[in-house]
């Protein structure tokens, strides 16, 4: 089963050394991978490539997703703040 993620989705890592950490999907890659970032450990300039099988979607950050889709600049501080203040976590 292939999971369909969108830009701005809030995900929890279920496998690996980053298990139970919360991230946002910042880019969709081919072959069942997405690039995730949290603005701190994995900044937007160096997102982590993660297999979608190892992620669980728990919500969506609309403002971040809209900015990423339109190509507008998103800052690490903005992403980190959005993840912290969302009522998802």
Give residue ranges: language-model regions.
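Short, charged beta-turn/beta-strand-edge "cap" motif at the junction between a beta-strand
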Residues: 16-19
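Ferredoxin-like alpha/beta domains used as RNA- or RNAP-binding modules
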Residues: 1-7, 14, 24-89
